[in-house]
Amino acid sequence: MSNYRYSKLNEEEISLEDMPSSANQILTRQEQIIQEQDDELELVGNSVRTLRGMSSMIGDELDQQSTMLDDLGQEMEYSETRLDTAMKKMAKLTHLEDESSQCKMIMVLSALLFFLVFVLLV
């Protein structure tokens, strides 16, 4: 792309020497200007196509990441449910109020431990 800046043209800046002397020169200059504009439009078109491709790839990536985040959210909810269940069971075990319940639990667990050791040794 060219770095042309457009500014207001003062009448004093125009001289007869700057102006083409024949219609053929005017036509040639106009064709050159049109060709330059076509070349610049082609560059702009290429840039637009590149940006379109990039935006399409970004959209695809966002769709994939959205799906992955949804899956992660579902797995987190499942894990949270399982953790809540385990915490409730632990709370129930640790809140045995009376000593007789605690003693019964200790005896049952001890008997289970001895049974497992006996089975492993035999």
Swiss-Prot record:
Gene Ontology terms for molecular function: SNAP receptor activity
SUPFAM superfamilies: SNARE fusion complex (SSF58038)
Membrane topology value: Single-pass type IV membrane protein
CDD domains: SNARE_Syntaxin6
Transmembrane segment boundaries: 101-121
Record bears the keyword ATP-binding: no
UniProt cross-references to Pfam families, sorted A to Z: SNARE
Domain (t-SNARE coiled-coil homology): residue spans on this chain: 31-93
Disulfide bonds listed in the record: none
GO terms (BP aspect): intracellular protein transport; synaptic vesicle docking
Superkingdom in the source lineage: Eukaryota
Signal peptide: none
Keyword Coiled coil: yes
InterPro entries in UniProt: Syntaxin/epimorphin_CS, T_SNARE_dom
Cellular localisation: Membrane
Keywords: Coiled coil, Membrane, Neurotransmitter transport, Transmembrane, Transmembrane helix, Transport
Membrane topology (Extracellular): 122
Cytoplasmic-facing ranges: 1-100
Gene Ontology CC: Golgi trans cisterna; membrane; presynapse
Family: Belongs to the syntaxin family.
Role, per record: SNARE promoting movement of transport vesicles to target membranes. Potentially functions in retrograde trafficking and in the endocytic recycling pathway.
PANTHER family: GOLGI SNARE BET1-RELATED (PTHR12791)
Protein name: Putative syntaxin 6
Organism: Caenorhabditis elegans
Gene name for this UniProt entry: syx-6
